[in-house]
Amino acid sequence: MGLEKSLILLPLLVLVLAWVQPSLGKETPAMKFERQHMDSAGSSSSSPTYCNQMMKRREMTKGSCKRVNTFVHEPLADVQAVCSQKNVTCKNGKKNCYKSRSALTITDCRLKGNSKYPDCDYQTSHQQKHIIVACEGSPYVPVHFDASV
């Protein structure tokens, strides 16, 4: 009797695991935003090689060089709070963008003109600017970095 139950439960367990497993390793838009744009520690953000190191570490130079990226050096909670601040229109025309009330510490990374994959070389620029992020979900969190102004 015990063996029969095991033989019935095993295929059921396999089905459940097959259904659950794909979602386990999937990066959500909010997780992608954090990976690509958040660096609260910002420990070496003043280094001229900061962008080269971070763009590689955060997997934005796999297969091609991402042309432009911004890292925000503020606590995640402060960046998430932007989603309840001034509503503005996104560059793509959508209405789910929000502008920070105050200037935040950021680092802009721009691909140098003569740089080609796989040798992605970035110009590092440290600034204090307002950020504009697109927000979605429940809870309402940043999912896209739209601009810095």
From Swiss-Prot:
It catalyses: an [RNA] containing cytidine + H2O = an [RNA]-3'-cytidine-3'-phosphate + a 5'-hydroxy-ribonucleotide-3'-[RNA]; an [RNA] containing uridine + H2O = an [RNA]-3'-uridine-3'-phosphate + a 5'-hydroxy-ribonucleotide-3'-[RNA]. It comes from the Eukaryota. Its EC number is 4.6.1.18. Coiled coil: none annotated. InterPro entries: RNaseA, RNaseA-like_dom_sf, RNaseA_AS, RNaseA_domain. Disulfide bonds join C51-C109, C65-C120, C83-C135, C90-C97. Substrate binds at K32, R35, K66, R67, V68, N69, T70, K91, R110. Glycans are attached at N87. Its main location: secreted. Residues 1-25 form the signal peptide. One of its GO terms (biological process) is defense response to Gram-positive bacterium. It is found in: Secreted. SUPFAM superfamilies: RNase A-like (SSF54076). One of its GO terms (cellular component) is extracellular region. It is an enzyme of class 4 (lyase). PROSITE patterns: RNASE_PANCREATIC (PS00127). The keyword Disulfide bond applies. SMART domains: RNAse_Pc. Pancreas. The keyword Ligase does not apply. Keywords: Disulfide bond, Endonuclease, Glycoprotein, Hydrolase, Lyase, Nuclease, Secreted, Signal. One of its GO terms (molecular function) is lyase activity. Belongs to the pancreatic ribonuclease family. Monomer. Interacts with and forms tight 1:1 complexes with RNH1. Dimerization of two such complexes may occur. Interaction with RNH1 inhibits this protein. Endonuclease that catalyzes the cleavage of RNA on the 3' side of pyrimidine nucleotides. Acts on single-stranded and double-stranded RNA. This is Ribonuclease pancreatic.
